[in-house]
Design a protein with these regions (language model features):
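Short, well-ordered beta-strand segments in beta-rich or mixed alpha/beta enzyme
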Residues: 1-8, 34-63
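Short, surface-exposed ligand-recognition loops at beta-strand->loop->(often short) alpha-helix junctions
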Residues: 7-18
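An amphipathic, aromatic/His-enriched active-site/gating alpha helix that lines ligand/cofactor pockets
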Residues: 16-35, 53-84
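Short, low-order "capping/linker" segments at domain edges
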Residues: 84-90
Length: 90
């Protein structure tokens, strides 16, 4: 699992790219899906939980086609990433 947050110029524009071109690219790098959250305190902040291992994520962010895709989606900042450190049963 990978948790990422970023700020975007326009959520609808970002979501259009995230759910199409970016989804295809993520799948190519092993992503099995994602959950998207909007921040209630910052209208331009998006949080995403990816069903993705660290190697797949690293492969994705190292792909030279990704930075132009992020720019096209309207990212205002570079995504900040946290990796799942553990999972508890309750």
């Amino acid at each position: 699992m990978v948790l990422a947050t970023t700020t975007v110029e326009d959520f609808d524009r970002w979501m259009k790219v995230f759910s199409s071109t970016s989804a295809d690219k993520r799948k190519h790098h092993g992503s099995k899906g994602s959950l998207v959250f909007r921040d209630p305190n910052e209208a331009d902040r998006v949080w995403v939980i990816f069903d993705w291992d660290a190697e797949g994520w690293q492969s994705f962010v190292s792909d030279p086609e990704v930075p132009p895709m992020l720019k096209n989606a309207g990212h205002k900042s570079k995504p900040q990433v946290l990796t799942l450190a553990g999972e508890l049963g309750s």
